[in-house]
Amino acid sequence: MSDQQRGPSTRAVHAGLPPAEQGTPLTPGPVLAAPFHLQGAKDAAPYGYGRDGNPTWTAVERAIGELDGGETVLFGAGMAAVCAVLEPALGPGDVLVVVEDGYPGVRGVARDRLAPRGVEVRFVPTDSEAIVAACEGATLAWIETPSNPALDVADVAAVAGAVHAQGGRLAVDNTLATPLGQRPLDLGADAAMLSATKALSGHSDLVLGAVSVRDPEWAARLRAHRSQGGAIAGPFEAWMLHRSLATLALRLERQSANALALALWLRERPEVLDVRHPGLADHPHHAIAVRQMQSFGPLVGFTLDGAERAQRFLAGLELVAEATSFGGVHSTAERRARWGTDAVADGFIRFSAGCEDLADLQADLARALEEG
């Protein structure tokens, strides 16, 4: 049976593990090393210096690559992965199409680092037709689907076709869905980026990033960028990520189920003005989400009546932490407008469903809504 014929939990549990060998551990531990023994030529061994490579990186890169369907390069943060994709690929006169309602750090790189170098930056909403229309002459398109925090969905295959017709490439931020919820490379994307800080690691205790591609030359350039810039992951953190992958399918299944159930429940609450979730049948991009996603992820967006009302709600929660980021086993929520980087209402709440029991989460939210 091929790997892709196996179920998601089986693939996640076995991802990146070495072949069974008598007397060796089932799961390899972290390799803590700066220099490695290297006699003779610089390429006489697979590892020579810790900034260029580490067996623990190799193991987790192999694991993510198996889930993503590509060759993966690990980075010390999601933004390091973003910069490794964007900065070497774009120069004066090139055109970058980037969604305006995705992760604000990406927009910051485009606006503050690429545009001053002569890159033409086109900001567009996460809408398939708008993105396709903006792709004329594009060198690279960057989309995030579902977008964060508004949870809009772009048709990856349609955007890939449009940018490829211009001779460009498509990169997809797949952080929210993870490779078990969506496989952008299979849909035609050239690169799939992950902030492994979030659902991929899932315990809110790591800051890491990864990029998967199918072009070996691009993978080599990503590794060179990582080494030259020092944007590396610590081996212990890389090992923790690999360890966390074994439970990814279980976590994602519970979190996605909780998120959809809460979205349906919140729609019936009189205190809630609006609910956003790609799994809802009346979501404007629901049909696209059903077609290209295997699960809809842990996020729910909903709007309360103003900033003060939203803050009272957050203050009244007991099980749910008020914190940024998302995708962890602990449910979190925040009022996104406090950052000033997202075009959302003052009372918009980004809620990340964790692995708690649904009834307990509903009771916590109900009390905070009623008392706030």
What are these regions (language model features)?
Residues 2-4, 18, 72-268:
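Conserved PLP-enzyme active-site core in the AAT-like
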Residues 39, 52-53, 191-299, 303-336, ...:
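Active-site C-terminal subdomain of aminotransferase-like
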Residues 15-17, 32-36, 51, 76, ...:
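Pocket-edge structural micro-motifs
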Residues 1-31:
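Short conserved active-site loop signatures built around small residues
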Residues 111, 121-122, 251, 315, ...:
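PLP-dependent enzyme catalytic core of the Aspartate aminotransferase-like
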Residues 9, 26-30, 45, 71, ...:
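A generic secondary-structure signal marking the coil-to-beta-strand transition
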Residues 31, 35-84, 105-113:
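Conserved N-terminal alpha-helix of the aminotransferase class I/II PLP-enzyme fold
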